[in-house]
């Protein structure tokens, strides 16, 4: 399975005992690798348009294998903070996106078995940030996004559909009130985001 979609929560006890510290990685620019040759700039946190905190359960399916990762998410006008946890409650990855830089931490020894925190951030932002926030970043690499009431699809520079996101929320409700299904059409994996609880607050108006 591609490293970016592996979510391993059942880690052996021996590995856990040898991996009890977080590894800090150097801050990087506000972009993520969406394939081996392409870097995509991310929208700013404030472009979401509101502040958001949530507990979510991410389920990743590839072929016949499904793994789960509980996450906590906080979005404010100046930053995005997320943390992923093991099934026993240990924080195993975290990320902060602020001041156009991304800083990540992964539990020592687990880097090869966990999704890259930047990819978790990309999936979150692609599902929730408005299409207007994504227009310029996608246009800069020749990609574009088509949005409907209950889905959005990302097309590459060859007009091939690459990612399709389906929203199962009831009409007129926030996208996170139902499951969000993220399908990578070329790499063949599916991510389901279930929001267990959330709080949404309008950002203060600029004077």
Where in this protein do the model-derived segments appear?
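C-terminal motif of bacterial Sec signal peptides marking the signal peptidase cleavage site
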Residues: 16-19
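Extracytoplasmic beta-rich ectodomain segments of secreted or membrane-anchored proteins
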Residues: 63-98
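Bacterial signal peptide processing site
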Residues: 21-24
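Bacterial N-terminal signal peptides that target proteins for export
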Residues: 1-9
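Acidic/charged, solvent-exposed loop-and-adjacent secondary-structure segments enriched in E/D, K/R, S/T
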Residues: 102-129
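Post-signal-peptide N-terminal segment of Sec-exported extracytoplasmic proteins
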Residues: 38-77
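Gly/Pro-enriched, hydrophobic low-complexity segments
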Residues: 141-207
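A mature extracytoplasmic/lumenal domain signature
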Residues: 84-88, 97-101, 106-110, 195-197
């Amino acid at each position: 399975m591609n490293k970016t979609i592996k979510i391993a929560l059942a880690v052996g006890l021996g590995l856990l005992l040898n991996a009890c510290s977080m590894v800090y990685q150097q801050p990087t620019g506000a972009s993520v690798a969406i394939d081996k040759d392409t870097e995509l700039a991310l929208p700013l946190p404030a472009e979401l348009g509101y502040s958001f905190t949530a507990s979510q359960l991410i389920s990743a399916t590839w072929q016949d294998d499904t793994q789960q990762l509980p996450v906590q998410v906080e979005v404010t006008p100046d930053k995005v903070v997320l943390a992923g946890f093991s099934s026993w409650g240990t924080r195993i990855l975290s990320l902060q996106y602020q001041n156009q830089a991304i800083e990540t931490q992964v539990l020592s020894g687990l880097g090869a078995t966990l999704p890259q925190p930047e990819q978790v951030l990309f999936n979150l932002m692609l599902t929730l940030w408005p299409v207007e926030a994504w227009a310029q970043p996608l246009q800069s690499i020749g990609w574009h996004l088509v949005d409907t009431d209950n889905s959005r699809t990302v097309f590459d520079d060859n007009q091939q559909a690459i990612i399709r996101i389906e929203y199962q929320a009831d009409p007129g409700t926030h996208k996170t009130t139902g499951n969000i299904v993220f399908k990578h059409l070329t790499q063949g994996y599916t991510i389901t985001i279930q929001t267990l609880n959330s709080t949404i607050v309008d950002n203060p108006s600029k004077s």
